[in-house]
């Protein structure tokens, strides 16, 4: 008899979902359940929309055309055709599709917005979103084609096609399924659009929010790796822990700096390989004057690690605060206020400027942190700077074996590529017959941020492989004197990646380790 998989934990959606819960649902680790109060809000919202329709109110996208065609009034008998045509003309995306988790994060973001009860979406539409999230499927959504201004119209239109069985699905391993096969395999009912369902589904910042959600999750893992690897670097280079003292961070109390310094200190606890004494405790006499073999302070890539890492962590924290608000916000237009004070409100909650700016800021922080890791690799592999380790950490005869020389150059190339693109949000371009005369480009910002996160992961993977080699070269295969945390880290790496005894191709190992770093924090 086949063993049954344990049921997934349920995340109950009312007014608020946090980023960890959202990622659990998007990544298939939890199922989503609509809380009774949210269901009641959505039913009330649908009822308010019904009253608007019966009273023939002048409401954008319900009794009007779209965008600059909003001055064309539409009769009630054409509402279904209007909604269908909205999806048809918007489903114009191109480029590679969003990955499985990111596409599901987009679906979840749309559901959370609609569940606030101000969009008038039908109960059946909400059920189709929930069913898709609780399946093992994702919509196949082209990644390019949205300016993130009237929300993410284009990618969300492709989501609607998928829900209708007219677009493709992705299964968990990325295999593409046609609409009919996806509906069958997921045991899904095809979506039937009514009233303004199409506009409620496409008009919002859900694609950029979904991408940003996955970005945030990846950055948390990579940030943990950056701390762990910096601590191990200190052990390999006989680094000084004085610069990580709590008293320094107390005098400059940025939360990220304090956190980074504390975690660095914890990682080297029990190490005999770092220098712990305070320089100023030494008293000089006449015989001490002159040049010492080593400076009393480390280079900035070690000494200033709490400040550099901490600034990045504070940027991520700001990104996460903004993202949490955006995820739980109503980003539709028009909206139907729950208090019923007016039939509908027309505005611009679909403008993705918050996600655009925070994604650009996070991309900048990621590039800075990748630059720190690249400089750490350079110092570790340079025999003039690595305090007695062999050049490029080779084990065989120098010259015959080049060690990590190629990998070090790859790290430099990756960083150069990260620096080749700047912020997206400053490049607003008027479009849509000047109706959208300013646009956020938030989805582009989030996508570019993701590309930089992937490059950072690859640089950290190179650093990790170099450090495992350096630790064994410095301390022997038994890792004598290395901290317990450092030993666990090297041993975990060695379970998958053997020492570089002689030169071998490293590209596949770097890629595999980078994927691991994005998904799991260090031991």
From Swiss-Prot:
Q: Which InterPro entries match?
A: Aromatic_Lyase, Fumarase/histidase_N, L-Aspartase-like, Phe/His_NH3-lyase_AS
Reaction equation(s) it catalyzes: L-tyrosine = (E)-4-coumarate + NH4(+)
GO terms for MF: identical protein binding; tyrosine ammonia-lyase activity
Supply the Pfam families for this chain.
Answer: Lyase_aromatic (PF00221)
Q: Which residues form the active site?
A: 60 (proton donor/acceptor)
UniProt feature coiled coil, ranges: none
**Domain of life per record:** Bacteria
Q: Where is this cross-link: 5-imidazolinone (Ala-Gly)?
A: 149-151
Q: What is its EC number?
A: 4.3.1.23
**Residues annotated for substrate binding in this entry:** 89, 303, 432-436
Post-translational events: Contains an active site 4-methylidene-imidazol-5-one (MIO), which is formed autocatalytically by cyclization and dehydration of residues Ala-Ser-Gly.
Listed A to Z, the keywords are: Lyase, Phenylpropanoid metabolism
Where 2,3-didehydroalanine (Ser) occurs, the residues are 150
- Which BP terms from GO are recorded? phenylpropanoid biosynthetic process; protein homotetramerization; tyrosine catabolic process
Q: What does this protein do?
A: Catalyzes the non-oxidative deamination of L-tyrosine. Has very low phenylalanine ammonia-lyase activity (in vitro).
The entry's family comment says: Belongs to the PAL/histidase family.
Subunit description: Homotetramer.
Q: What is this protein called?
A: Tyrosine ammonia-lyase
Organism of origin is Cereibacter sphaeroides (strain ATCC 17023 / DSM 158 / JCM 6121 / CCUG 31486 / LMG 2827 / NBRC 12203 / NCIMB 8253 / ATH 2.4.1.) (Rhodobacter sphaeroides)
């Amino acid at each position: 008899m086949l063993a049954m998989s344990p049921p997934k934990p349920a995340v109950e959606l009312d007014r608020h979902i946090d980023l960890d819960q959202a990622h659990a649902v998007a990544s298939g680790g939890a199922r989503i359940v609509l809380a009774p109060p949210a269901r009641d809000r959505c039913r009330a919202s649908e009822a308010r929309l019904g009253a608007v329709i019966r009273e023939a109110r002048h409401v954008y996208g319900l009794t009007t055309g779209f965008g600059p065609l909003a001055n064309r009034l539409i009769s009630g008998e054409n509402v279904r055709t209007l909604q269908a045509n909205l999806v048809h003309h918007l489903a114009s995306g191109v480029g590679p599709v969003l990955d499985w988790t990111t596409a599901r994060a987009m679906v979840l973001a749309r559901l959370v917005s609609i569940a606030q009860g101000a969009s008038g979406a039908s109960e059946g539409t909400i059920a189709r979103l929930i069913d898709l999230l609780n399946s093992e499927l994702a919509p196949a959504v082209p990644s390019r084609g949205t300016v993130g201004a009237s929300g993410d119209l284009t990618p969300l239109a492709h989501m609607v096609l998928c829900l209708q069985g007219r677009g493709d699905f992705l299964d968990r391993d990325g295999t593409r399924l046609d609409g009919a096969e996806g509906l069958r395999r997921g045991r899904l009912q095809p979506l039937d659009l009514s009233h303004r369902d199409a506009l409620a589904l496409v008009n919002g910042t859900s694609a950029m929010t979904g991408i940003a959600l996955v970005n945030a999750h990846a950055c948390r893992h990579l940030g943990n790796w950056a701390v762990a690897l910096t601590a191990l670097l200190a052990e390999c280079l006989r680094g000084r822990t004085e610069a990580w003292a709590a008293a320094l961070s107390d005098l400059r109390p940025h939360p990220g700096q304090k956190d980074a310094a504390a975690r660095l200190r914890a990682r080297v606890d029990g190490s005999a390989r770092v220098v712990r004494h305070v320089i100023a405790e030494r008293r000089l006499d006449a015989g001490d004057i002159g040049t010492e073999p080593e400076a009393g302070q480390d280079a900035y890539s070690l000494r200033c690690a709490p400040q550099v890492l901490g600034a990045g962590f504070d940027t991520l924290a700001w990104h996460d605060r903004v993202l949490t608000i955006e995820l739980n916000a109503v980003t539709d237009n028009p909206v139907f206020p729950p208090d019923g004070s007016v039939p509908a409100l027309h505005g611009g909650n679909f403008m993705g400027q918050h996600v655009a700016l925070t994604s650009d800021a996070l991309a900048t922080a990621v590039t800075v942190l990748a630059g720190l890791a690249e400089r750490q690799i350079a110092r570790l592999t340079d025999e003039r700077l690595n305090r007695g380790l062999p050049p490029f950490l080779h084990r065989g005869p120098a010259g015959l074996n080049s060690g990590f020389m190629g990998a070090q150059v790859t790290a430099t190339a990756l960083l150069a590529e990260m620096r080749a693109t700047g912020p997206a949000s400053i490049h607003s371009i008027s479009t849509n017959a000047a109706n959208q005369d300013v646009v956020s480009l938030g989805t582009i910002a989030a996508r570019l941020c993701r590309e930089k996160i992937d490059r950072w992961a690859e640089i950290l993977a190179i650093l990790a492989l170099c450090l495992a080699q350096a630790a064994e070269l410095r301390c022997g295969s038994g890792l004598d004197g290395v901290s317990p945390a450092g030993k666990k880290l090297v041993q975990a790496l060695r379970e998958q990646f053997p020492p570089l005894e002689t030169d071998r191709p490293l590209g596949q190992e770097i890629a595999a380790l980078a994927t691991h770093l994005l998904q799991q924090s260090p031991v």
